[in-house]
Amino acid sequence: SYTYRVRIEYIDGFDNREVIYSNESEAVRNVDDPVLGDVVIMGEEKEGSVLEARTDSLSDDDGIASIDVAWERSRDGRNWVSLTGENTKKLNLDQTVVGSQVRVKATLVDRFGVETVLHSQPTRIIENVNNVPSGNVLIRRVSN
């Protein structure tokens, strides 16, 4: 949103210093540069493991002001729902995501305030781990 003009200084044929200014330009507007790079998920796709969202390959010629991440899950690979409260770069895989795919939704804001939303590739279906049963066994004798 700046304007520019040119200032030219020169010495004329009579040894006089001359200064000329151009007219101001129109306001220069930001052209949104595309975000380059990918959001990548690292880790084992199994209950009890931790996945990590990697955003370090993302770049924007306008500079990056912020990157926020959120995790989403899907049972069918088409309909995605947010995992409430999961807004950090790490996701602990618990029973709630078993049988689902997960992906990262990254919201990047550049230094001009332009927001870009990117999604990682979805994981494979999160595997279940057979949890060890807990509790006590009670055996009663039933007689006739």
List each language-model region with its residue ranges:
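Ser/Thr/Pro/Gly-rich low-complexity disordered regions
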Residues: 1-144
